[in-house]
Amino acid sequence: MHHELTSLLKKLLCSHKDVSRLPALLRTSCLFGQGEKADTLYFIEEGLIKLTRTNDLGGRVILAVYGPNELVGEESLSAGKHFYFAEAEVLSPATVYKIPGATLESVKSAHPELGVALVRGLVDSNLGFAQKLEWLSLHDVESRVLYYLEQLAKLVEPAEDQGYPLPLTQLELADLVGATRETTSTTLNSLEKRGFVKLSRRLLTVYLRQGKAAAAGGENWP
């Protein structure tokens, strides 16, 4: 997200009397459900939040995973009555700011620069979804897995062994990259043998240094 938008949100909204800070949200906590009235915007201070869309047949896709200084619930910015397109669920212990739509509108009216920054942020978000569509449509499963692991690693701090711990199950990664759990599991096992990842229960550790070194040697890495 644009640094300008992050700064404005912290300056104008995070300390606002009508904005609530929700600390220490646990994994699987739900910020909002798919189809619920969209009347609140959320700003992530720490932790990871996933957006999941479910169709009428029970099929799922994780649209995105967001981290610190990012927004979820942008549907609340639309004029009129709108609903959340996907469910927002906590992936790792998180702290978020809950911004009522009416409060946001009031602050935007007093500070037009916030509205401009929000538009720029939405453009970035749209480009991100377009890029995801490109990867889903034009790349094989291993390439998609590697791409998303690298993107997600940017949202967390490295551990002492320089690995980036991602609190994802293999099924969640499959829902993110648009593949079956079985295919994703086979791909991850192959990547683990090559030293790119380490698999644990509800945790994938990504080793970017090994991946970049492998890419320099001609192996697949985005």
Predicted region positions:
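Cyclic nucleotide-binding regulatory module and flanking cytosolic helices
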Residues: 1-30, 71-72, 76-79, 110
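Cyclic nucleotide-binding regulatory domains
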Residues: 24, 29-92
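Residues that scaffold the ATP/ADP-binding catalytic core of kinase and kinase-like folds
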Residues: 52, 74-75, 106-107, 148, ...
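Short, well-ordered alpha-helical scaffold segment located
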Residues: 70-71, 103, 172, 211
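Polybasic "coupling" helices that flank or enter modular domains
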Residues: 109-178
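Phosphate-/nucleic-acid-contacting segments
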Residues: 152-222
